[in-house]
Amino acid sequence: QEWHQRLEDMLAVKDTVVGVLDEGGLCSDAWVEGQALAHELGHQDHLMGMVPDQSKFLGHSVGLQLDESPVVAAGFDRPLPIGGTMAIEPKVVHADGSIGSEDTWIRDEDGMRPVTADGAWPWLTEW
């Protein structure tokens, strides 16, 4: 049940990030809002890694290179441009495992829309 809640929390972080970008918000604002929600939910020591080795982003653009700019991180004070694609991937990492989501999105004139599954199948798959 604890892992299910962690997944639900990361899906809420994902929805927050997508919501900011959907409205044309800055990538840095998406980071601030997503990180703040994760901290509010108690994940400050496990968001995107474990202290002291946490990554400081929640998503990155995708294109000809695997990781392109802009990034959902501090300092990227610009929106994802129309036609831009981004992998949004909030996760928590613990000593006994990790859980989160990762989907690719495109921003068009109507906002953000998923290119990959984004909930088309059950989020939790146990192996």
Language-model-derived ranges and their functions:
Residues 1-127:
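Active-site neighborhoods and metal-handling regions in enzymes and metal-associated proteins
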